[in-house]
């Protein structure tokens, strides 16, 4: 009875409007434009993403802040059989179903400084928060410590540009 019913009211349809693979970090960036009633999300939340109705949805952190324009993106680490094939299977214009947002990763604090520590793909909630701060700046100072095996290539350059925005 509960199969495919829980969360049904949180499902929206979107379209992939870009796919980019960052070879040096084995990460795929998937840009999505939602078509209808996405209520928005907070930095650090995730959604169940279904790129193909023949497959089960997978949970991925929403890597972008919400601007209210329907655009968002996911940074997905190529870790297993499913995620390692996404870059070759996903196409611009392809339909996608999102369910969410879920989770709570809070950045709320009355302290003047925050220290963020992330490793690898764990950077995604912090990237989303950087996007949110670019839209609505805060007086808090943020120190970000990002641990990765490679600090070169376009993926890292994009993360650095996001941090400096």
Regions found by a protein language model. Give the residues of each.
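A short, basic/flexible loop-to-alpha-helix module at the beginning of a structural domain
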Residues: 101-111
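A generic secondary-structure signal
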Residues: 104, 132-133, 162
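Hydrophobic, well-ordered secondary-structure elements that form the walls
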Residues: 62, 93, 105, 122, ...
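Ferredoxin-reductase
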Residues: 4-97, 134, 140-143, 147-151
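Histidine-anchored nucleotide/phosphate-binding helix
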Residues: 123-137
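C-terminal helical cap/extension that packs against the catalytic core
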Residues: 141, 151-165
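Conserved beta-strand elements of the Class I
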Residues: 113-117
């Amino acid at each position: 009875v509960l199969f495919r019913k829980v969360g049904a009211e949180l499902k929206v349809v979107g379209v992939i409007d870009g796919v980019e693979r960052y070879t040096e970090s084995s990460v795929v960036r998937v840009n999505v434009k939602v078509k209808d009633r996405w209520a928005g999300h907070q930095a650090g939340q995730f959604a169940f993403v279904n790129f193909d109705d023949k497959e089960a949805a997978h949970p991925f952190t929403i890597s972008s802040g919400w601007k209210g324009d329907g655009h968002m993106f996911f940074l997905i680490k190529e870790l297993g059989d499913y995620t390692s094939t996404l870059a070759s299977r996903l196409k611009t214009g392809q339909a996608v179903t999102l369910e969410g947002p879920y989770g709570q990763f809070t950045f709320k604090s009355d302290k003047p400084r925050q220290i963020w520590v992330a490793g690898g793909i764990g950077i995604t909630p912090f990237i989303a928060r950087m996007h949110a701060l670019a839209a609505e700046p805060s007086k808090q100072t943020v120190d970000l410590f990002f641990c990765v095996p490679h600090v070169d290539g376009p993926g890292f350059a994009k993360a650095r540009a996001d941090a400096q925005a």
